[in-house]
């Protein structure tokens, strides 16, 4: 397994030789097989995908790999079955040799909301925390990022990334199966750090903000997306139990409260650049994600509330700078 051979020199060139050495052990085939009992099945599914060569690649406005004309002797139905083996597809959409992977989330909508407000990514080294299957990382590369490292603890998402890498073969975009807690403290080597859909899952959100800050070089930019609630600086909602059927939701601050958190953590140039109510057009079940989705999490009689009676999901995007 040579997925990460190109990763280690990039990290070493960023002054992270020791981290690169640690990851060579953590990401070795033997270690991954030991950590993940279902890894052999995923590897078999990956190897069963056809060898195809895309006639075109587009990452700027979409994530498009090849066209239907590239399939040659491979049938469209066989490729669909191969891709469906990696269900559920949550982040996207992707177009793969003419097959439209209609994912649960229209992640391209979030990208369009944030892109006009962040520092240009051209030439930047980016860390994407909780990156899922790497969809936004591909969009970052399309926007000119020099190097993108995604960290994602869920193996199915990492394997979906490897599906795309099978055809894109990009040595400057990697998704590795670790969490933020596995990143060495204060590497201070990334120009941009993204954390989207992570903060509300952390028992200690301020510690998470400090971890993100430690990953940035001085002058680097944090792009933070999270669930919020309406209210003033003292408004922070902690669900007494589940939130939208999720067990692991801890703190939902107001815009003003999260601004204060970022200030107390030492960030400057803090701005909330977008706040958008999540709709069932942006997050929904599809043939590529056949489990429950947003419509099942909301009060059927009041779309402004979750089924538990809490405020329905409202997501904000913040930018902030490490001085």
Swiss-Prot record:
Record-stated family: Belongs to the class I-like SAM-binding methyltransferase superfamily. CmoB family.
Top-level division of the source organism's lineage: Bacteria
Function, in words: Catalyzes carboxymethyl transfer from carboxy-S-adenosyl-L-methionine (Cx-SAM) to 5-hydroxyuridine (ho5U) to form 5-carboxymethoxyuridine (cmo5U) at position 34 in tRNAs.
EC number: 2.5.1.-
Source organism of this protein record: Geobacter metallireducens (strain ATCC 53774 / DSM 7210 / GS-15)
Protein name: tRNA U34 carboxymethyltransferase
Residues given in the record as carboxy-S-adenosyl-L-methionine binding sites: 91, 105, 110, 130, 180-181, 196, 200, 315
Keyword Transferase: yes
InterPro entries associated with the record: CmoB, Mo5U34_MeTrfas-like, SAM-dependent_MTases_sf
Record field: catalytic activity: carboxy-S-adenosyl-L-methionine + 5-hydroxyuridine(34) in tRNA = 5-carboxymethoxyuridine(34) in tRNA + S-adenosyl-L-homocysteine + H(+)
Pfam families in the record: Methyltransf_9
Quaternary structure (record): Homotetramer.
Cited SUPFAM superfamilies: S-adenosyl-L-methionine-dependent methyltransferases
Any GO MF annotation of the entry: methyltransferase activity
Keywords: Transferase, tRNA processing
GO biological-process terms attached to the record: tRNA wobble uridine modification
